[in-house]
Each structure stands twice: as structure tokens, then as C-alpha cells.
Amino acid sequence: MANYKVEDIRNIVLCGHGGAGKTTLADTILNATGLVKRPASVDEGTSICDFDEEEKAHKYTIESSVIHFDHAGKRFNVIDTPGYPDFIGQTIGALWGVDNAAIVINAQAGIEVNTRRVFAEAKKAGLGRMIILNKMDGDNIDLPKLLEMIKDVFGAECVPLNVPLGIGAAFKGVASTLNPPADTADAVIDPKSIHENLIETIVTADEAVMEKYLEGTMPSDAELSSLMIKAVYEGTLIPIFCVSTKTKTGLTELLDGLAMCAIPPTMIERKAQNAAGEEVTLSPDPAGPLCAQVFKTRVDPFVQKLSFIRVYSGTLKAGVQLSASTARRGIKIAQIFEMQANETNPVEDAIPGDIVAVAKLEELETCAVIGDLQMDRFPFPTPMVGLAAAPKSRGDEAKLSGALAKVTQEDPTFLCERNEQTKQLVITGMSELHLQVIRERLKRRDKVELDTKEPKIAYRETIQAKSEGMYRHKKQSGGAGQFGEVHIRMYPFPEGTDPEAFASNKEMFPSMKAFHYEPSNNFLWIDAIVGGVIPSNFFPAIEKGFKDRMEKGVIAGCKVQDVAVELFHGKYHDVDSNEHAFKTAGSMAFKTVFLQAKPGLLEPIVKLEVTVPMANVGDINSDLPNRRGRPMSMESAGGGMQTIVAEVPLAEVLTYNRTLASMTGGQGSYGIEFLRYDVVPGNIQQQIIASAELAEEEE
């Protein structure tokens, strides 16, 4: 059993923008608490938390990493996360596995794009939030201006719990604003000037204490300590700490502050669903029913698959048969590990609040719930940047499949699927950098190299007019021949049209006998044969001919959709007619009539949501017409950000991430969601058809 209680656990994620010093802070804490004897350095490739080979090569965090330490009677589980938005999936998973978020800000750089993003995500996850101003030993820091900006962007709840004594090279310590020292001569900001605001912010967490305070009675230290955690929990206080991880100045005070302010697992109310679908509140009781969730998966070359788990209720034990939401049968955990970055330490069990890992359980996936309850999946963002990928060596195709399966397990923001229309394997991630790192990992870990290029757009073909025609397939080469004749009418069949109502229109189809509707491509075919001119046993072959041609396309090699076909006449031969003949006749009749029915191309239209600083709204709106975009709405996203919603052809936003980064200096984000297919303008249509014809000739 653990030698600490649930109420003594403090789970914190370190998050923020890249270069803020999160990993260095985690490494420094391990060194300061005596768990690691040697100093660690990200730049020198000796970081404890950045142990992955790609992290060492790039000198920044790519994977979240779990460490633990004890301080001031508290058990800390801390998760270091990537700072670049390209790897936001790792941060999202970590946020939903903890109770507190410490947003680390580079005091020299101020609030950056991912600072805003993770702050909003931490609020969405219902976490207690704290801000750590790092690199206080740096040059050109305007602390009053930075604090004012933090309040403007994140709210008046952001109040310093300490202020620096000196700044830049003169930074030599911090002074408490909760208990200001008598001598504050070296303080950059007088802590006494913040003290009253801090106390008022804290006491608002309890009406009775606040009333006494307003009447002149100062709360006791015990009351302040208790109310501070409550205020952080309720979001009415977001404490700010000053530190330099490089010199370790302010580090002890930071750890003391985290022990004093961070929320324990006993305070956050977690919800789950029972077998009946009813909502239940989880109790962080070691004796309660087990409920734990996987928030991260890592494929380790030594211990194979590692599943990182947060326990919410009950006690997780090894050697016990357990149920899991992603396993068909029960699972049995062989060993439970306490993690120190990439080091594993076996433990007997895990209580509520514990963050542990288990190995070699293929059935467990990220977001899987262990126990008999269900919990919601984490809100991972949808990846937007896709590349068509193929192994450089044809002999690596089988190996590539397994390698990509590993990446898909590890990274919820990576997708891999084969587009049946374009015949391309498309890998999709958060950015080009994200996909580049994945390619590097595949090369190192799995010995598979990839060639990538911009993916093809899955255009569709359709018609805009009614047409009628026939095709006779006749072949005689000695012996039994082939004969089949098919007469059809073709109609535009817009998406949303009721197939039964359409086929039952007696004015259009007076001889309709039956109809068949295929929703996948919105295709309706109608049997209107009179007098048995084609035996009904050949109808499936004719329909197969239609469908094969629709799959292959007619004008540009794209799938056909939104078409209705009426089979109204034909001929057959007692000897030479067979299924193959009528399948061919059906396919060629479809092609012939399609070409007469004003054929055209459809393209996927997506909803584009772009969130940018107010200063960039004009740039975004000016750029949309160049992408054939149609603005739909605009609303405030908070923190000086605006969200613009528009409808845009997918073909126009394949590389939008580059444009957006250029226009906003990396401060913008976007998402796309498929809406519908729409007609491609004529001039663009001709270019697409010409490219398809050229590609066919080259093949």
C-alpha cells in the first residue's frame, strides 16, 4: 500500500508555450529534491524528461513525461508536456489525467500562442490553475507590464503569491505577498501593495470569513490556507509564482506554494456512467468500486506497450481480473509501475489520485476505462494536415502497416487511412512538423522510410440534366457469343431527395415495377421494364455494371453520386446473353448516357473555423475570397481572440496551416469539418479533368 493518503496527493501538469522552461523546471525539481544527483540539460541531451531520441535531436519536448517527488508532506505527480501546438494531443491527455495545471510563461517573451491555448484547455477540464513566471534572471523583463497583460488576458483572478527581489542578473530571491517581509527594498513590486488584493481574493471563497474580514477581523493562517485551495478550486484565485530554473532562485518557494495551493484529488468531482447509463459521482475512496482511465499510451522498445493510468476510485491491483471498456474480455495486470520519466518502479497497487503505468496490455487504448463504469473520451482536436504516404521501398509495405498502427496507438491526433477513391494512403496530423517527427520516428524505431506528397482531393462526378440512350454489347468469336442491350434514362438526383417519393412518381415512371436505393453515393435505380424484354435474372448484373462504372468514374476517374437511372427497355438473346454481357452493357450504357447529361464535378466543402488575435481578423477576411471562401459568422473567443467561420472548398485549405502561421506569427489556430459536396466552377473543373486525363495516360 502507498505510504501517503489520497488527500496528500497533488497532481499537476506543466504546460505552456515552447521554450518557457517546463522541462528544465521538471528536471531541476528532481535534482533539487535529491531524486536525481546530476544536473540535467535539454540542450546537452541529458534531460530526464526529454529521453526520446527525437526529443534529444530537436531539443524540445514531443511526448508528455510523468515524474513524482515528495515535498512538504505532499506526494506530487507532475506531467511535463510539449510546448508547441503541433503536439497538443499529448497536453490534452495529460490535462484530463490531473487536477491542476501550472501554466509556465517565459517572463521575457510574455503570453504566447500556446499559453492561451493551454489556459483555455485547463479551464475546460475543470482544473485548478496556477501561473509560473520563469526565467526571471533574463534581460528586458517588464514585470508590471507583464502582470497587467496576464490580468487583461486571463482575468483579475491572477494574483502574484510572490514577487522578485531584483530582476535579470540581479534576481536573488522572492518576497511573499501573503506574508510580506518588513524589508522590501529590493522588491521589483512592493509585496505589501498586492497583499490586500490577495487576501480579499482568498476570502471571497467563504462568505462568513469575508464578512468578518470586512468588519476588520483578519483570517487566521489556517483559514487562509484552507480558503486558498478552495479559491483555486473555484477559479476565483489563480496564483502567480516567480522563479528562475536556471539559477534555482525561487524554486523552494515555488514548491511550497504548489503544496499550499494545488487541489487534492478529494476536491474535484468526477462523473461517470453506470451500466444503465445513469450518471454517478466518483468517490476518491480506496475501498470504493474501481474506476481508472488511460490518459496516455507509449510504445516502448523495451517494455513494449505502456498504458498510463489515473485512478479515480477504488484500488488498482495486479493479478486481478478486471473489465476494461476497450477489451472484449477481462484483462489481468501483471505489474503496476510508478514512473520517473522513462524509468519504471514496480508497486503493489494504486489508490485514487495515483498516476501509474501498466505494460503489455494490447487491449487498452487511450481513454479506456478500467472497471465497470464508463467515462467520457478526452476532447482531442481533429488533425487537419494530411500527406499521401508510401514506403520508399516496396518491400516495406507490410512493415509500414505495423509501424503506423503503433503511432496510431500512441498519438490520438494522428490518423492513417486509405482513400479508396484516390488509392492513396493518407497520414494526417496537427501540422507538417508533427508529421515530420512521426516520419523520423518511423525511420529510427521501425526502419521504415516514407515518401510523402500533397494528397489528391476526392472529387465526385454527377450530372445536371436528364438524358436517354442505349448500349448494345455484341461479341461473336466462334462458339457461344455475348449479347446484351440496355436502354436507360438518367436523371439528376440531388442529395436529400426522397427516393421512394421520386420513384413512385407515376407521371415520370408509369411502368415502375421496383426500385433500389444506395445511400452511400445517393444512387437510385428504377426497374421499368415492360413485357419481359430483359429477363429479371439479368437485373443484378446490369446494376453491377452501373455501380462499377460509378466507382470508376466517367470524366475524371472520380466516383459518381446523386444520379437516378431508369432501366426501361432492352433486348436479350436466348443463347448469347449472360451475366457478363449485361454487366458490360449496363456499364457502357451508363457511361454513354452520363456523357450526354451535362456531366460535371463536385468538390468537398468544409466549415473552416479560424481563431486569431483581433489584429489579424482583417487579414483572414481578406484572404477568404482568394480561397473561394464564403464568410458565415464571427464571434469573440475571449482573451482578445476572434473566431471566424466560413465555408471553403477543401482543395483551398490543404496547406492553410502555413498561410495562417505566416499571417498571425503562429498565434492562430483552425479546424475544418466536412459539410457537403458542391459544384466545381467550370474553369477549375477543366483543369482537374485535364490533370486526370494526363495521369491516366502516364499510367
Regions of interest found by a model, annotated:
Residues 1-699:
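Structural and coupling elements of P-loop NTPases
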